[in-house]
Amino acid sequence: MSQYHIPVMLSEVLEVLAPKGYESYLDCTFGAGGYSNAILKSCYCSVTSLDCDPHVIERVEQIKQDYGERFSFIKTNFADSFGKLKQQKFDGIVMDLGVSSMQLDIAGRGFSFLYDGPLDMRMSAQGFSAEEFVNTADEEEISDVIYKYGNESLSRRIAKNIIKYRKIARIDSTRKLAEIVRYSIGFRKGKIDSATKTFQAIRIYINNELGELERFLANVKNILKKNGRLVVVSFHSLEDRIVKNFFKENSAKPVARSKYAKDEIKIDQNKWLEIITHKVLTPSSQEIRLNVRARSAKLRAAKKIL
């Protein structure tokens, strides 16, 4: 495994997913293969992995060499995967909704404000880039995106300064955007860089990350076997809210009845999930010390019962 990639909450994911021999699992976000590799290593099972990032292919080939026919890969976004999975159903599904270390640490991908590179941020290297967005969107749209997806209270000031700067020169690098944001906000106490929220917001918007998550969850029932488990690790409060509400809306509860009734408790047939993690799981302090990028991770899991 790449030395720079540390799968977030790996032990918790494996404990909740509970892989078993001869079962099949779906890794919706291959990244550098951390979850896929760990699941395959845990028992004699099979894993299908998804990712739309063309840069993962080298790691995909490594895992294929290690596990042979037990591992398969489909180059696709998880929200677009249903037709390509050819009616397969899985005993467990895992999703890591964060940007991988591999994406953050390559300056040319344009995800990170720590390295100077082209202002891109696209997961699939196709479609509208962050550079196009900050150089063409109007002030109100930029402000709304930064506020909605980054929860940045100074979004209007940042947007105003982006408009001012781009009248002088095109904003075409991560360094330029980060400097504009830092200038707009000024110094903030703490270890988190002032540009963090703005970069996160633009990345989420550019890749339609929340919409893709909602689209996948709306259809996930069709590819999960009965008693199959869905495990989701999110890194943003809006992502976590979507997952939490989805689990809540689809979780089965006993139908109310008289305490004197002798018939068995019935389950609402429109509800098909049983929540496994009644309280959200978060990384241990030890993991955060080893991998600061894990600090905002939240894990939720549920089981299909119908």
UniProtKB/Swiss-Prot annotation:
Reaction(s) this enzyme catalyzes, per UniProt: cytidine(1402) in 16S rRNA + S-adenosyl-L-methionine = N(4)-methylcytidine(1402) in 16S rRNA + S-adenosyl-L-homocysteine + H(+)
EC number: 2.1.1.199
SUPFAM superfamilies in alphabetical order: Putative methyltransferase TM0872, insert domain, S-adenosyl-L-methionine-dependent methyltransferases
GO cellular component terms given for this protein: cytoplasm
CDD domains, per database record: AdoMet_MTases
Function: Specifically methylates the N4 position of cytidine in position 1402 (C1402) of 16S rRNA.
Protein family membership: Belongs to the methyltransferase superfamily. RsmH family.
Protein name per its UniProtKB record: Ribosomal RNA small subunit methyltransferase H
Species: Rickettsia typhi (strain ATCC VR-144 / Wilmington)
Upper taxonomic lineage: Bacteria, Pseudomonadati, Pseudomonadota, Alphaproteobacteria, Rickettsiales
